[in-house]
Amino acid sequence: MDQSKPSFFITTPIYYVNADPHLGTAYSTIIADVQARYRRSAGYNVMFLTGMDEHGEKVAEAAAKHGMTPQEWTDSQAPHFKELWSKLEISNDDFIRTTEPRQHHAVQYLWERMKESGYLYKGSYDGWYCVPDETYFTDTQVQKGDEEYGSVGQHLCPDCHRPLERVQEESYFFKLSAFQDKLLKLYDEHPDFVEPAFRMNEVRSFVEGGLNDLSVSRTSFDWGIQVPFDEGHVTYVWFDALLNYMTAVGYGVDTDEARAELAYRWPAQFHIVGKDIIRFHCVIWPAMLMAIGEALPEHVFAHGFLTVRNAETGKAEKMSKSRGNAIAPQDVIDMLGVEGYRYYFMTDVVPGTDGAISFDRMEQVYNADLANSWGNLISRSLNMSGKYFDGCAPAKPASFDAFDNPLAKIADGLVERYMAKMDVLDYGGAKDEVMELIHAANHYIEDSEPWALAKDEAKADELAFVIYNLLEAIRIAAHLLMPLMPQTSAEALRRLSCEDEAASDDLKGICTWGLLAGGQPVEKGDPLFPRLA
């Protein structure tokens, strides 16, 4: 492993395999992928982890419904996730499954560490359990059924509003209650541990309300990782699932190589999660790590839900198959293409809040930003360069001060402004910085009128200057849009004969104005973003 570069470790949640991947799972994964690609371009040695959460009662029920064993069911689902991630250009470095031997080993090692820590005890659980969310609830947390949710008198999950099961079983408990003050201190000393900031307020309020010890083993079913010192118990699914982040970087493996990898990679810089699992990642997970003396992740970024407008009520509703309002990823790909898909969800939907989506808005954003602005700039500029300079780029100007150069002025400091936004996952803000250059370049064409300059031999130097600047703006914009749209950005560089630059890990250096060699062949090609009718 090359440890000469700084490590950057980013994760998605590992996804339940009770159903096929959907827009929500794709959303989390693309958020992480964009950050991973950006960090690679900025010189980091990136570890990007995703995977599948394959244990628990919910998975066992889904398998039984399909007439399979749980292992057969999870094996049948893994290709669906991998195929979608490949289609969406996800660049994960590892894909972990909790049924893998490495996860079994790590979880059993965790049990031994927890036993030694003194934060584990055996007791009996008597309370409510939500199978779909794999979550325990106390009597005071339970929602009573009403006319809107469930039936009157039913005990419902306060999060998903589905009926709860009453569970009574012997269990091992993790002393989560012992970590209330430690967690509040963590939030005080590291206010950016939970992002966005308003999510931190939610987490803090929950912890301040008091913590109950957590049941971390089950005896009423057997689809899980066995507790090493008690054969009748299997691991509670979240106690298992959360550990995947450390399993993937060598936790519990007794070799020099694994210990070196863990020391280099851990802690993670970002866990990307949905807001519905924030308590597991910002309360239970750090408490578990504190109990066994391990470092905490630097940031947990919780994004909102994707919502659609209910035509009857006019209200925004979370997408779900049960509501019948879910949109399949393939439907969006068919409309926008993969790169348009990535661009829309990463720049028009604010990651920290719930995002209302619609096909009308997708078309509007695609046409305005990609077809009319970015794609149009590429087509017009390459066409003029090929037409006026025999299929090549003009020579590099001897001086960038010979004529007015508004694009170079915008490019000055652009990378720094862009990186400041990307560092905090503000992809929409980063896009705005790049689009300022793209819009300016389109205006530059209209203001400088290259077609008029081409008719006057005395204006040959100015024409070359204008076209060079347009091509250089395209080159820099392509690098900055690469994390969002890797294929079309690489294609734009190829058409400039700059394809070797696509693998650069020096973003600041490669985006220095004036690096375009000049004189190289250029290719107009077909439109990268055909306008949607």
PLM segments and residue spans:
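Generic structural concept
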Residues: 371, 375, 408, 412, ...
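Feature captures the FAD/FMN-dependent oxidoreductase FAD-binding
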Residues: 99-120, 129
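Cys/His-rich short segments
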Residues: 117-180, 184
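A glycine-rich helix N-cap at a beta->alpha junction
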Residues: 73-93
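A charged helix-plus-loop insertion that forms the helical arch/lid used to bind
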Residues: 62-75, 147
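Structured secondary-structure scaffolds
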Residues: 2-50, 97, 102-106, 156-387, ...
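Basic, alpha-helical terminal appendages of large translation-related enzymes
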Residues: 1-7, 123-128, 132, 155, ...
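Long, amphipathic alpha-helical stalk/connector segments used for oligomerization, subunit docking
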Residues: 350-353, 357-361, 366, 381-430
